[in-house]
Amino acid sequence: MPRDYSLDKVRNIGIMAHIDAGKTTTTERILFYTGKVHKLGEVHEGTATMDWMVQEQERGITITSAATTCYWKGHKINIIDTPGHVDFTVEVERSLRILDGAVAVFSAKEGVEPQSETVWRQADKYHVPRIAYVNKMDIIGADFFNVIKMIKERLGANPVAIQIPIGKEDTFRGIVDLIKMEAIIYEDDLGTVMDETEIPDDLKDLAEEYREKLLEAVSEQDETILEKYLEGEEITEEEIHKALRKGTINGELVPVVCGSSYKNKGIQPMLDAIVRYLPSPLDLPPVKGMALATGEEIERKADDSEPFSALAFKIMADPYVGKLAFFRVYSGTLNAGSYVLNSTKGKKERISRILQMHANHRQEMEAVYTGDIAAAVGLKDTTTGDTLCDENHPILLESMDFPEPVISVAIEPKTKAAQEKMTTALLKLAEEDPTFKTYTDQETGQTIIAGMGELHLEIIVDRLRREFNVDCNVGKPQVAYKETITKPVKIEGKFIRQSGGRGQYGHVWLEMEPAPRGEGYTFENRIVGGVIPKEYIPAVDAGVQEAMQNGVLGGYPVIDVKVALVDGSYHEVDSSDMAFKIAGSIAFKEGMKKANPVLLEPIMKVEVVVPEEYMGDIIGDINARRGRVEGMEARAGAQVIRAFVPLAEMFGYATDLRSKTQGRGTYTMQFHHYEEVPKNIADQILEKK
């Protein structure tokens, strides 16, 4: 099966937005118009609305599918879903990794909100070209020009309006296209009957003013346009499109369009802007990775003839086909039924089927090509962030970093009978979401779930009920404390049982030292001259890691430690993996006691937005919660306070903030780093344990 769309006609985009900007409606409308245009041949006037109802019913698919494919004017568009809530910034990061471009949706009333800033900065980090869509032009308080000002001031971007609205609030009825210099007026509620006419008289001056700004912006991108502009010559539509595309892809400007998704206005021109200005996989630099054999950096060009390489970016449990692994192909092609190497795990996997999701149906694919996004059935060991590649040309693409969970709760099913069902469901959910973990507390035997915030865990519990029919009781949220060491030690570990029969003999010397915060655990083998045979070394490492699950202070996991195996001895007959594993474990536990162990707690990056008159109270409150205020700034009539606060002090903050600001304050927080707990507080925590 040959490729159906050439690579320059493929767009992989995300729709980024704050929760209330209207992302879902916008996505649905895109799918509606693209689906309808794609099926023009068979849709008679009467069935269009019918089709729309089916889509409404199938809406579940469009919203939850990690990637949906649709078509517009000879282009193939893959839309990757990005959530808007701050507990899910990890989801946003992982979708931005595999996108080529994005549409940032803003509400015409609120404009740039704190969460839109977070997402925008993440997109900056991955250099994602984007266009802005100012939605909700029909609501009270809509102000297109104010949003442009906010994009410039708050996001430090260079917004260039390529349209201006005709009317606003309940009189919003169309747009002025500043490139063609004509008006598009919507005649019906479905937004399919459009009238292209002259610009209304009362908007001519404004249109001229914004056309000038547009021409200034594009002339900076292109010498020939600049000369024509200065000479006062006519600049063609084609030249404007070309310069806008160049500026968007190199991140120097952001084309801005407007509309009302709910009222079906402005969607088609936005789709035109997606295919005109956002990049295809060919417009971006080759993807970089590491050659497994040599450890050198290598790259893969976006080309079907290159060896196959792809990144799995989301795992979903599907009621019909089991586990779906969504992946993005960076190079080469892949046929259904073939084998790939999961180079992250070092395992060969067979892809039994390949599916592509459309608005209301899924399509079986015989093959996928460079730039495609699809879902694979049959991958058993693949998890989020893994590289899939051609086994004869292995490459390891840069994986995604996922933060450790910072909050945990005990959970139990309401009926004993549902225990097994709950355990299976939790493991499935943990497979989908790398920032969600589930384990059993060694001391109490309770099942513990851990995640990135209270909302994150609430949603997990809700999914248990909705998708797996398991009702659960949930304990009080607990902070995920960790332990570490603060000074280097050298320690001996012996496990020797030699009293008749088969004995046990394991003997190791370890050097332990603190690692920089956030580095995690490293194990180094410094054995020389075979004092411990090679085959027992991994067992020592495993023993150390097992001991790290429960620290010596309060049984919390141990992080940020460097361990080196430096010496030891073995016995020809009695030594075994088991003996060395136990010796490694004993040595680590003993060493940790001597290495000044300390307790660590998660520190959250908190952003509070409050009216000025409450600022003193709120800062006082943050200090009382052991917080450090990092900075403040004024933002649209309110003050933004940025601070680092221990998670332990943030429980119930939403309620406190509401009462302190009469419901006018809002806040967002996300995990930032781990830090040592002050001694007096650590003592209190460990006493309660």
From Swiss-Prot:
Pfam families: EF-G_D2, EFG_C, EFG_III, EFG_IV, GTP_EFTU
Residues that, per the record, bind GTP: 17-24, 81-85, 135-138
Subcellular location: Cytoplasm
InterPro entries named in the record: EF-G-like_DII, EFG_II, EFG_III, EFG_III/V, EFG_IV, EFG_V, EFG_V-like, G_TR_CS
Principal location: cytoplasm
Keyword terms, alphabetized: Cytoplasm, Elongation factor, GTP-binding, Nucleotide-binding, Protein biosynthesis
GO CC entries: cytoplasm
GO biological process: ribosome disassembly
CDD domains: EF-G, EFG_III, EFG_mtEFG1_IV, EFG_mtEFG_C, EFG_mtEFG_II
Domain tr-type G: 8-282
GO terms assigned for molecular function: GTP binding; GTPase activity; translation elongation factor activity
PANTHER family documented for this protein: RIBOSOME-RELEASING FACTOR 2, MITOCHONDRIAL, TRANSLATION ELONGATION FACTOR G-RELATED
Function recorded in the entry: Catalyzes the GTP-dependent ribosomal translocation step during translation elongation. During this step, the ribosome changes from the pre-translocational (PRE) to the post-translocational (POST) state as the newly formed A-site-bound peptidyl-tRNA and P-site-bound deacylated tRNA move to the P and E sites, respectively. Catalyzes the coordinated movement of the two tRNA molecules, the mRNA and conformational changes in the ribosome.
Family: Belongs to the TRAFAC class translation factor GTPase superfamily. Classic translation factor GTPase family. EF-G/EF-2 subfamily.
Name of this chain's protein: Elongation factor G
